[in-house]
From Swiss-Prot:
Keywords per UniProt: Cell projection, Ciliopathy, Cilium, Cilium biogenesis/degradation, Joubert syndrome, Membrane, Phosphoprotein, Transmembrane, Transmembrane helix
Single Gene Ontology BP annotation: regulation of Wnt signaling pathway
Protein name: Transmembrane protein 237
Disorder cited: Joubert syndrome 14: An autosomal recessive disorder characterized by severe intellectual disability, hypotonia, breathing abnormalities in infancy, and dysmorphic facial features. Neuroradiologically, it is characterized by cerebellar vermian hypoplasia/aplasia, thickened and reoriented superior cerebellar peduncles, and an abnormally large interpeduncular fossa, giving the appearance of a molar tooth on transaxial slices (molar tooth sign). Additional variable features include renal disease, abnormal eye movements, and postaxial polydactyly.
Principal localisation: membrane
Subcellular location: Membrane; Cell projection, Cilium
Membrane topology according to the record: Multi-pass membrane protein
Binding partners and assembly: Part of the tectonic-like complex (also named B9 complex). Interacts with TMEM107.
Length: 408
């Protein structure tokens, strides 16, 4: 080994140093990453002898770089610190710089295998490749994204935060004087007291003016007419009784004074007959409302069973027909003039023939109206029409909904 090294050294003294080829530019260098060469970890004795001989040679340019190699040997940790402070370059610049350094280092080698590059550049390359430590993936991603250790939340901290959400506040909340209310897509400050007053007024107005439906209106009108019908029943009964009493008083005993009846009653005949007809119509309709005429068989069965409401409706209807049958007689009484007057409708001796059936019909009407009023007063709240028209409709809807669900 020594002989070979000596011979090579003599040849090195005899031969002049070779001229270095030109360094290629950055555009000529391909961007592909060169394969990493395994760094030499151990120095062989031959390399040590070559380094010693290289130091003795005066023509080598490496004499000026001896202090850097000495400093590297004395302070091996210096390149590591310099590498840690060095910022990381982008991928393209890093590949280009590494390719430059690798190409320049390969070109600066002579035939003897000794690097002609300054020792300082080798020192910079060597720790960058050798002292590169592999970091875990999580820490590497965290460093690239700029995440600090304080920003990382562990499982224990999350459990503590979840527990703190459900804890009751220790302090006592106090009401604030101003409240922000949204008006026309903007929040405006308002006093709490005024807001409470306005809400109270709104509640009162809602209580006073509830929303009505058509069913509620129909039910209210029906009940109001039933009250009017009850009043008409009593008033009709009183008017009919008063009418028959006045007729018998004016006619005298055994209808002996019919001329007096005609003279006194002619002013009352037409107005009273109209009032009687109106009251009879209202009472008859009110009595019919209390019967379920949608089911005629049920109405007939109630009449045959002497139901008070069915009997009252039948009696009112009969009284109305009888009253209408005597309408012409009432008109004739209203136009009464003595027989001695020319153009009179009443001849002598026919008063009793005309008035006697009229008095009997009025007596029957009074009896029928009185009996009907008694029957209805026995059960004044009974109203089958209300139960069938309103209550049954409410019950029919759920049945229809059930049928629809069953069919679906």
């Amino acid at each position: 080994m020594r002989t070979d090294s000596g011979a090579r050294l003599e040849e090195g003294h005899l031969r002049p140093p070779r001229a270095l080829p030109p360094v290629p530019s950055q555009d000529d260098i391909p961007l592909s990453r060169p394969k990493k060469k395994k760094p030499r970890t151990k120095n062989t004795p031959a390399s040590a002898s070559l380094e010693g001989l290289a130091q003795t040679a005066g023509r080598r340019p490496s004499e000026g770089n001896e202090p850097s190699t000495k400093e590297l040997k004395e302070h091996p940790e210096a390149p590591v610190q310099r590498r840690q402070k060095k910022t990381r370059l982008p991928l393209e610049l890093e590949t280009s710089s590494t390719q430059k350094k690798s190409s320049s280092s390969s070109l600066l080698r002579n035939e003897n295998g000794i690097d002609a590059e300054p020792a300082e550049e080798a020192v910079i390359q060597k720790p960058r490749r050798k002292t590169k430590k592999t970091q875990p993936a999580e820490l590497q991603y965290a460093n690239e994204l700029g995440v600090e250790d304080e920003d990382i939340i562990t499982d224990e901290q999350t459990t503590v935060e979840q527990q703190s959400v459900f804890t009751a506040p220790t302090g006592i909340s106090q009401p604030v004087g101003k409240v922000f209310v949204e008006k026309s897509r903007r929040f405006q400050a308002a006093d709490r007291s005024e807001l409470i007053k306005t809400t109270e007024n709104i509640d009162v107005s809602m209580d006073v003016k509830p929303s009505w439906t058509t069913r509620d209106v129909a039910l209210t009108v029906h009940r109001a007419f039933r009250m009017i019908g009850l009043f008409s029943h009593g008033f009709l009964a009183g008017c009919a009784v008063w009418n028959i009493v006045v007729i018998y008083v004016l006619a005298g005993d055994q209808l002996s004074n019919l001329s007096n009846l005609l003279q006194q009653y002619k002013t009352l005949a037409y107005p009273f007959q109209s009032l009687l007809y109106l009251l009879l119509a209202l009472s008859t309709i009110s009595a019919f409302d209390r019967i379920d005429f949608a089911k005629i068989s049920v109405a007939i069965r109630n009449f045959l069973a002497l139901d008070p409401t069915a009997l009252a409706s039948f009696l009112y209807f009969t009284a109305l027909i009888l009253s209408l049958s005597q309408q012409m007689t009432s008109d004739r009484i209203h136009l009464y003039t003595p027989s001695s007057v020319n153009g009179s409708l009443w001849e002598a001796g026919i008063e009793e023939q005309i008035l006697q059936p009229w008095i009997v019909v009025n007596l029957v009407v009074a009896l029928l109206v009185g009996l009907s009023w008694l029957f209805l007063s026995y059960r004044p709240g009974m109203d089958l029409s209300e139960e069938l028209m309103f209550s049954s409709e409410v019950e029919e809807y759920p049945d229809k909904e059930k049928e629809i669900k069953a069919s679906s």
